[in-house]
Amino acid sequence: MADSIRLQTFPSKPRVFVLTDISNEPDDAESLVRYLLYSNQFQTEGLVAVSSTWMKNKVCPQDIHKILDAYAGAVDNLNKHTHPDYPYPSANRLRTLVKSGPPMYGFAGVGTDKPLTDGAQLLLERIKAPIEDPLWVLVWGGTNVLAQVLLSIRDQCSAEEATKLRAKLRVYTISDQDDTSAWIRTQFPDVFYISSIHGWNQYGLAAWTGISGDKYYGFDQGGPDFSKVSKQWIKENIQIGPLGSAYPDYLFIPEGDTPTFLYLIQNGLGDREHPEYGSWGGRYALTDASDAGQQGKHYSDMSDSVIGIDGKTYRSNQATIWRWRNTFQNDFAARIQWSLNPSLASTNHHPIVIVNGSRSQKPLQFEAEAGSTIELDASQTYDPDGDDLTFTWWQYREPSATQWLVQFEVSELGIEKLDTQGKRIKVMVPEPEKSCMDLISRTPLAKGQLLHLILEVTDSGTPTLTSYRRVLIQSTNKDLRGGKPLKEGEELNAIGDAMKNYTD
C-alpha cells in the first residue's frame, strides 16, 4: 500500500489563469474536468468565462460553477491520493476565481472608453501582483480579456513598467478565436505567446488537434491510437464518479483546449520556459528566431517523427501531442479513479524518478566533451505502490535540430545498459565531427549540439502510469577538433554546399 508521504511533490507550481468560452460546445467543460484533476500541481488564479467566434454574444460563468459543484463532490477523495504538502484546492476557493469577460465578440469589448470587466480586472490584478513567477494565461476561447488588460497597461503605466508587466506573461492559446489575437501579437511582440497559426478556423492544421482530432480532421490515419479517445473508452473510463459524470459527450473532438495545461503538467518531461523541448502539450518554436527586428516571442508549431500503432512513421505537428496519447489518457483514467475511490491500496500512483540522486522534475544538465561518456543511475527510482517498473531511455532528436531534416543535422547518442533492467546506463557523446560542427560551413564549434535524452519509467499498475526525466547533454569541443577538410578553392557558404553529398 502506498504511503502518501512517498507520492509526487510539486515544489514549484505554475500560476495559471484560464480564459474559457465554456458552453459554445462541450469541449471546454471536458477540459475543465481534466484540469481540476491536476489542480494540485497549479496555483490557479482565475477562471474567466469569455466569448469567441463560436459564441459571440454571451459568456457562461454559471457553467464553470456547475463543474466546480461536481469537483466539490470529489475533492476529498482526490486529497487521499496526493502528498499531504500539496493538496487540491477547495471548491470554495476556486469559486471565488470565477469571473466574466465582455459578452460580446472580440474588439467590440475592447477600448479605452470601455471599463474593464471583472474578469479583466482580476487578470490585471494578478499580473500586477508582487510575485516574480510568470503568470500562464491559458486561452480556450477568444482573447479580448487579455487585450483589455494589455491596452490598460499600455495606457496607464510607464513604458518601463508596462514592459516589466508584459514580461511576466506566458500565453498559450488554442489558435485564434477572435479578432484581438493577431492584434496582441502585432502590438505586443514581446509577450511570450504560444499559438498555432493557420488560415482562419482551419483547425485541422493546428498542433493542438493532436489531442484527439485524427479522425475528425483526417490527419496521420493509422498513427495515433484513436481507441483511447473514443466515446466508448471515455464512457467506461472517464464519465464515472462525482466529477467524471460532469464530463459531457463530445460533439466534434474531445478536449481541444487540454494541450494548454498538458504543457504545464509536472511529470519530468517538459520545461515550461522552453516550448521547443516538447511535452504532453506539444512542441513549438519561435516564428522569428533572429536577434534583430521585432525580436518577438511568438512560438508556433514544430513537427515530430513518430512510429504509429501501424508500425509506419508519421511526421506532423499533431504528432508532437498524439505521440504521448497513451500515457496522458492512462494518467487521466487513473485520476478519475482517485476521484471516486479514497483507497490508496486499490488505485495506482506515479513512479518517482530519481537520476544520479536527484528527484527534481527539472531537466538534469551535463556538459560533456564530444567523444566522452557519462553514466546515469536511476536505481533509486521507486514506485509508491510497490509495482514493477520498466525503464526506457531514448534520444529525443527533434529538439536538437535547427531545421526540418533532423537526421542530417542531429547526431545519435550511444546508449549502453549497465544492468539488465536498464536502471543504469552509459551514454556516449558523438565525436566532434557529428556533434560540434557548424551546420553549413562544417567548421568546428567549441559548443555544439544540446542533446536530449528521455527516461520513461512505467509501472505495472492499472492503468499503467509513466513518469519521466529529461537529461540535457551540452556537447563541447574545447580544442576545436574535427571539421571538414576543404579542397583548394572550395567554400561552404550555403546549405546546398553542405548537403550536396548527403544521402538519407
Describe the function of each predicted region.
Residues D388, T464-Y468:
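A structural signal for beta-strand boundary/capping segments at domain termini and interdomain linkers
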Residues K423-V427:
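Short strand-edge motifs at loop-to-beta-strand transitions and within beta-strands
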Residues K447-L453:
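Exposed beta-strand face motif in extracellular beta-rich ectodomains
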Residues M1-Q421, E431-K434, T443-L445, G483:
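N-terminal acidic, glycine/proline-rich low-complexity segments
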Residues V457-T464:
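Short, solvent-exposed loop/turn segments at the edges of extracellular beta-sandwich modules
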Residues N477-A494:
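Low-complexity, Pro/Ser/Thr- and charge-rich linker/hinge segments at domain boundaries
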Residues L450, R470-S475:
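Long, low-complexity intrinsically disordered regions enriched in Ser/Thr/Pro/Gly
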Residues L492-D504:
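Ser/Thr/Pro-rich, acidic low-complexity intrinsically disordered regulatory segments
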